[in-house]
Swiss-Prot record:
UniProt keyword terms in alphabetical order: ATP-binding, Cell inner membrane, Cell membrane, Cytoplasm, Membrane, Metal-binding, Nucleotide-binding, Protein transport, Translocase, Translocation, Transport, Zinc
Family: Belongs to the SecA family.
GO molecular function, one term: protein-exporting ATPase activity
InterPro entries for the chain: Helicase_ATP-bd (IPR014001), Helicase_C-like (IPR001650), P-loop_NTPase (IPR027417), SEC_C_motif (IPR004027), SecA (IPR000185), SecA_CS (IPR020937), SecA_DEAD (IPR011115), SecA_motor_DEAD (IPR014018)
Gene Ontology BP term (one): protein targeting
Binding site for ATP: 87, 105-109, 516
Function: Part of the Sec protein translocase complex. Interacts with the SecYEG preprotein conducting channel. Has a central role in coupling the hydrolysis of ATP to the transfer of proteins into and across the cell membrane, serving both as a receptor for the preprotein-SecB complex and as an ATP-driven molecular motor driving the stepwise translocation of polypeptide chains across the membrane.
CDD domains according to UniProt: DEXDc_SecA, SF2_C_secA
Organism in which the protein naturally occurs: Acidovorax ebreus (strain TPSY)
UniProt xrefs under SMART domains: SecA_DEAD, SecA_PP_bind
PANTHER family referenced in this protein's UniProt entry, alphabetically: CHLOROPLAST PROTEIN-TRANSPORTING ATPASE, SECA INNER MEMBRANE COMPONENT OF SEC PROTEIN SECRETION SYSTEM
Superkingdom assignment: Bacteria
UniProt protein name: Protein translocase subunit SecA
Membrane topology, record value: Peripheral membrane protein
Length: 917
C-alpha cells in the first residue's frame, strides 16, 4: 500500500528512467537539422571522428547523443526510415546494459542499430544475437546497408562455416549470429591445439534479440559438444555379472522405526521414477563382490572418489536388469537394442538412452556394446552470456520475467511506451467443459471471421495442437496455412502475408517470430521482385508497382474496418509471457485487433492448477454442454495458475544455475590455463613449477616434513626416483658423509637433480623445439582429465540429492566434493605431465617433432562429434559433425591432419572440419 502511494508521488523507477532518457532525446532531436545539411561523405566521416575521440579518452556515454543522431540521419538516407523518439529511448536502454521491452511492430531491429553503432566505435566488436540463422542473415543484410554506409564492417556467423570465414565474421565491427553458434564457437575455441585456430576475439558487448526466449526459455538446456569416449565395454560386462549376486529388498523401511521390510536385501526399486537405490547391506555386499573381482582394492569404499564411475556403472546395470524389460521398454532387432516409445508403442530407431543405461542393456542382452559418447565441453546460456563485459536485450514481453532477469543476469527491464497506443481488444477467456466443445467454438469463430474477410492467426502451444486444428479446418473446408517453426525463411514469408483479407494461419509460438504481420499483407516483397525483373520497361514496372500499392491500400482499409488481425488461441501456455507474445502479433503500431483464448477443463494447465475451482463454478451454475464460462474470476484463476508454474520454472532454472556455477568456476580456471599455454612463447616456468610440486609430494612420502633422519626411508626414495622419474641420486651416501642434513635439503637436492636431468634432455634438441612438445603434452593432459572430470561431475550430480536423507545440504555437499574432484584433476595433470617429461627419451629434434605431431593428431582426432542445443520449439536438437563420423572398421581409413577434408571443401582437414574436433 505504502509502495503504491510513494509510486504515485515520485513515479516508478521505470518512469524516472524514461524521463531521464527523454532529456537526451530532446538533445538528439535538436541536432537533426544540422546533420541533415551534411553530405553523405561528411556524415560517414563522423564515424572516424568518433573513433579518434574515443582513442583520446572520450567515453561512449558522452558520444551517445551525436552517435544516435548520425545513425538516425543515415537510416533516413539509406533505409528510408526515421527512428521514432521511443526507438531512441529503447536504444539508450540497450546501450546502458538493460532489457528494452518494446511491443511487436515497434521496430526493435531498427532500434538496435543505435547502440550497435555506438559500441562498435570502440573497435572491440559487437555481437547481435538472434534466435535462428534466417533472422541473423536477414538482419545482417538489411541493417548491414546502414552500417556499411556509415563506414563499419558487418559479419555473419553461421554453423559449418570454414574457420577463415568465421574469423573474418568475428573480426568485423559488428557480428550477427545465433545464440547456439556463439556458444559453440566459445567452446570450440577452448578445444583448439593451435592459437591461430581460435575464431572469437573477446566478448565485449552483446545485444540479444528475443532475450526472453534465449535467456529464459532455452536456459534449462546446456550447449554440449560430445565425442566418442573411452571404451568401457569390459566394465559393462563385469557389472552385468555382479547384478545376479545382489538381492532385491521387499517392503519399504519406515524412516523412524525401521520397520516395514518383509525381506531384507541389497537394493530397492522405485518403478515410478525408474530409479534404483542400494541399501546399507547392499553397499557392503557390492564392495565385497567388486573387491573379489579385482574391480576395487580390498577395504576400499564404493563411494571413494576413485570409484565414482563404478557406482555409475553398477546403478546402470541394476536399472537395466530390473527396471527395463525386453518387448516392453525395448526390443532386440538385428543385434541392436531399439527403444519402444512408452506412449505410442512405436520403435524409436537410432535413439539411445543416456548415462550408460543403453550400454548396460546391451550387456544384459549379450549384444554388441556400442561405445559411450562423452561430454567434451558444455556451458549453459546463463554462464556464457555472463562472460560478456556488457549485455543487453530486447523483446516484446520481458516485464513478467523482470525479477529473473535481475536476479540471474543483473539486467534491469525498462518498459518502452509504444509510438502509438494499442487499440487491440483482449477479450475474456472462454472455458468449456470438454476439449471437443472448445475446438467447435474456436472453429466457429474462425469460420465467422473468414466469411467476412477478417484475417485470423490461430496460436497453438505445440506442433501436436497445430495438427489437430489443421485437421479440423480441413474438415470444415476452410483454406489455411500451417507453420511449425521448422523452415524459417518460408515461414517468415507466410507470416508476412497473414494480414491479408480472409487469411487463416496456424502457428506455434515461435513460428515466424521476428516478422511483422502487416494488415492487408506485405507488399514490399512483391515490389522488390518487380524491380528485379529486367524484362519489364521502366514505365511497365512503375505501373505495376502503382497497381500493387493501390490494391494493398484497399486490402489494408478493408482489414482495418473489419477489426484488424484476429488472434485465436486454443490453449494457455504455462507462461503468461508466451500468451502475451501471441496477443502482441495483433494491434501493431496503433492498428486495431482482437484476441481470445478458447480453453477447456481438459487442458493440462487447467487440469493441474485451476480445473477444480472452475469446475466447481460450472457445476454451481449447472451449465449445459456447449456453453462456455466467460468471467474475470476465471481469467484471474488461470493467470494465478500460470504464476505458480512460472515460479516453479524459475526455481528449476535457478537451481540448475547454482549447480552449474560450480562447474563454471572450474571451467574458467581450466580455459584460462589452456589459453595461457596456447599463447605462452616459453612454458619452462610452468613445467618447472609442476615438476617441483610433484617431486615434493614424492619426497614427502619417504622423508616427511620436519622429521628426523631415523624416520627417513632414503632407499625407498632412491628406488622410486630411479624407477618412476628417472632421477639417479645417491642420497644415502650423501647423508652418511654429512654431519647434519635436513629434510628440506633432501627435497632441494631431489628437485635440483630433476631440473638438471630435464635441462640436459632439452639441451639435446634445443629449448625452442621442446616448447611445442611441452605445449601438446600439457594441452592433452588438461583436455583428457577435464573430460573425465565433467563425467565425474555428472555422476556426482545425479546422486547428490540422496545426501538430504543423511541430514546434509545436497548443494553444499556437491560444492565440497566437486572442489575435491577438481583438486584431484590438477594433481593428476601435474603428475602426468611431469612423469612424461622426465621419462621421455629424446634422440633428435626430428623424432621430437614427430612425437609432437602424433600427440596433436591424437588430441584433435575425436570421432563422432555431436552438438546438442535447445531449439525454439523447446526440444533438444543433436547435430552430428559429418567430418568426424566414425568410419566402418573394414575401411581402415584415417584422415590425417594434412589430408584433404572428407567434406569435399578442398581444404586440408586441419583447416576445415578437423578444427571442430
Amino acid at each position: 500500500m505504502a509502495t503504491n502511494f510513494l509510486t504515485k508521488i515520485f513515479g516508478s523507477r521505470n518512469d524516472r528512467l524514461l524521463k531521464q532518457y527523454r532529456k537526451t532525446v530532446a538533445r538528439i532531436n535538436a541536432m537533426e537539422p544540422d546533420y541533415e545539411k551534411l553530405s553523405d561523405e561528411a556524415l560517414r566521416g563522423k564515424t572516424q571522428e568518433f573513433k579518434d575521440r574515443i582513442a583520446q579518452g572520450e567515453s561512449l556515454d558522452a558520444l551517445l547523443p551525436e552517435a544516435f543522431a548520425v545513425v538516425r540521419e543515415g537510416s533516413k538516407r539509406i533505409m528510408k526510415m526515421r527512428h521514432f523518439d521511443v526507438q531512441l529511448v529503447g536504444g539508450m536502454a540497450l546501450h546502458y546494459g538493460k532489457i528494452a521491452e518494446m511491443r511487436t511492430g515497434e521496430g526493435k531491429t531498427l532500434t538496435a542499430t543505435l547502440p550497435v553503432y555506438l559500441n562498435a566505435l570502440s573497435g572491440q566488436g559487437v555481437h547481435v544475437v538472434t534466435v535462428n540463422d534466417y533472422l541473423a542473415g536477414r538482419d545482417a543484410q538489411w541493417m548491414g546497408r546502414l552500417y556499411n554506409f556509415l563506414g563499419l564492417t558487418v559479419g555473419i556467423n553461421l554453423p559449418q562455416m570454414p574457420r577463415e570465414e568465421k574469423q573474418a565474421a568475428y573480426q568485423a565491427d559488428i557480428t550477427y549470429g545465433t545464440n547456439n553458434e556463439y556458444g559453440f564457437d566459445y567452446l570450440r575455441d577452448n578445444m583448439v591445439y593451435d592459437a591461430r585456430e581460435r575464431v572469437q576475439r573477446g566478448l565485449n558487448y552483446a545485444i540479444v534479440d528475443e532475450v526472453d526466449s534465449i535467456l529464459i526459455d532455452e536456459a534449462r538446456t546446456p550447449l554440449i559438444i560430445s565425442g566418442q569416449a573411452e571404451d568401457h565395454t569390459a566394465l559393462y560386462v563385469a557389472m552385468n555379472k555382479v547384478v545376479p549376486l545382489l538381492v532385491r529388498q521387499e517392503g519399504e523401511a519406515d524412516p523412524r522405526t525401521g520397520e516395514g521390510v518383509t525381506k531384507p536385501g541389497d537394493f530397492t526399486l522405485d518403478e515410478k521414477t525408474h530409479q534404483v537405490f542400494l541399501t546399507e547391506q547392499g553397499h557392503e555386499n557390492a564392495e565385497r563382490i567388486l573387491a573379489s573381482q579385482g574391480l576395487i582394492p580390498e577395504g576400499a569404499s564404493l563411494y571413494d572418489p576413485a570409484n565414482i564411475t563404478l557406482v555409475h556403472h553398477l546403478y546402470a546395470a541394476l536399472r537395466a536388469n530390473h527396471l527395463y524389460h525386453r518387448d516392453q521398454h525395448y526390443v532386440v532387432q538385428n543385434g541392436e537394442i531399439v527403444i519402444v516409445d512408452e506412449f505410442t508403442g512405436r520403435l524409436m530407431a537410432g535413439r539411445r538412452w543416456s548415462e550408460g543405461l543403453h550400454q548396460a542393456v546391451e550387456a544384459k542382452e549379450g549384444v554388441n556394446i556400442q561405445a559411450e559418447n562423452q561430454t567434451l565441453a558444455s556451458i549453459t546460456f546463463q554462464n556464457y552470456f555472463r562472460l560478456y563485459n556488457k549485455l543487453s536485450g530486447m523483446t516484446g514481453t520481458a516485464d513478467t520475467e523482470a525479477y529473473e532477469f535481475q536476479e540471474i543476469y543483473g539486467l534491469e527491464t525498462v518498459v518502452i511506451p509504444p509510438n502509438r497506443p494499442s487499440k487491440r481488444d483482449d477479450q475474456l477467456d472462454r472455458v468449456y467443459k470438454t476439449t471437443r466443445e472448445k475446438y467447435e467454438a474456436a472453429i466457429a469463430d474462425i469460420r465467422e471471421c473468414h466469411e467476412r474477410g477478417q484475417p485470423v492467426l490461430v496460436g497453438t502451444t505445440s506442433i501436436e495442437n497445430s495438427e489437430i486444428i489443421d485437421e479440423l479446418l480441413n474438415k470444415a473446408g476452410l483454406p489455411h496455412q500451417v507453420l511449425n517453426a521448422k523452415q524459417h525463411a518460408r515461414e517468415a514469408d507466410i507470416v508476412a502475408q497473414a494480414g491479408r483479407p480472409g487469411m487463416i494461419t496456424i502457428a506455434t509460438n515461435m513460428a515466424g517470430r521476428g516478422t511483422d504481420i502487416v494488415l492487408g499483407g506485405n507488399v514490399e516483397k512483391a515490389i522488390a521482385a518487380l524491380e528485379a525483373d529486367e524484362s519489364l520497361s521502366e514505365a511497365e514496372r512503375a505501373a505495376r508497382v502503382q497497381e500493387l500499392r493501390a490494391q494493398w491500400k484497399l486490402d489494408h482499409e478493408k482489414v482495418t474496418a473489419l477489426g484488424g488481425l484476429r488472434i485465436i488461441a486454443t490453449e494457455r501456455h504455462e507462461s503468461r509471457r508466451i500468451d502475451n507474445q501471441l496477443r502482441g502479433r495483433s494491434g501493431r503500431q496503433g492498428d486495431p485487433g482482437s484476441s481470445r483464448f478458447y480453453l477447456s477443463l481438459d487442458d493440462q494447465l487447467m487440469r493441474i492448477f485451476a480445473g477444480d475451482r472452475v469446475k466447481a463454478i460450472m457445476d454451481r451454475l449447472k451449465m449445459p454442454d456447449g456453453e462456455a464460462i466467460e468471467a474475470g474470476i476465471v481469467t484471474r484463476s488461470i493467470e494465478s495458475a500460470q504464476r505458480k508454474v512460472e515460479a516453479r520454472n524459475f526455481d528449476i532454472r535457478k537451481q540448475l544455475l547454482e549447480y552449474d556455477d560450480v562447474a563454471n568456476d572450474q571451467r574458467k580456471v581450466i580455459y584460462q590455463q589452456r589459453n595461457e599455454i596456447l599463447d605462452a612463447p616459453d612454458l619452462g616456468v610452468l613445467i618447472d613449477a609442476m615438476r617441483d610440486d610433484c617431486l615434493a609430494d614424492v619426497v614427502r612420502q619417504y622423508v616427511p616434513a620436519e622429521s628426523v633422519e631415523e624416520q627417513w626411508d632414503l632407499a625407498g626414495l632412491e628406488k622410486a626416483l630411479a624407477n618412476d622419474w628417472q632421477v639417479s641420486l645417491a642420497l644415502q651416501k650423501e647423508v652418511e658423509g654429512s654431519d647434519a642434513i635436513t629434510d628440506e635439503e633432501i627435497l632441494e637436492k631431489v628437485q635440483q637433480a630433476a631440473r638438471e636431468a630435464f635441462l640436459a634432455k632439452v639441451g639435446q634438441v634445443g629449448a625452442e623445439n621442446f616448447t611445442q612438445f611441452e605445449r601438446m603434452v600439457l594441452l592433452q593432459s588438461f583436455d583428457t582429465n577435464w573430460r573425465d572430470h565433467l563425467s565425474a561431475l555428472d555422476y556426482l550430480r545425479q546422486g547428490i540429492h540422496l545426501r538430504g536423507y543423511a541430514q546434509k545440504q545436497p548443494k553444499q555437499e556437491y560444492k565440497r566434493e566437486a572442489f575435491e574432484l577438481f583438486r584431484q584433476l590438477i594433481d593428476q595433470v601435474k603428475n602426468e605431465v611431469t612423469r612424461l617429461m622426465m621419462t621421455v627419451q629424446v634422440q633428435s629434434s626430428a623424432q621430437l617433432d614427430e612425437a609432437t605431431q602424433a600427440m596433436e593428431d591424437r588430441g584433435e582426432g575425436i570421432s563422432n562429434v555431436t552438438y546438442s542445443s535447445p531449439t525454439e520449439t523447446g526440444e533438444v536438437e543433436t547435430v552430428a559433425d559429418a567430418a568426424t563420423a566414425a568410419q566402418p572398421a573394414a575401411a581402415g581409413v584415417r584422415v590425417g591432419r594434412n589430408d584433404p577434408c572428407p567434406c569435399g571443401s578442398g581444404k586440408k582437414y586441419k583447416q576445415c572440419h578437423g578444427k571442430l574436433a
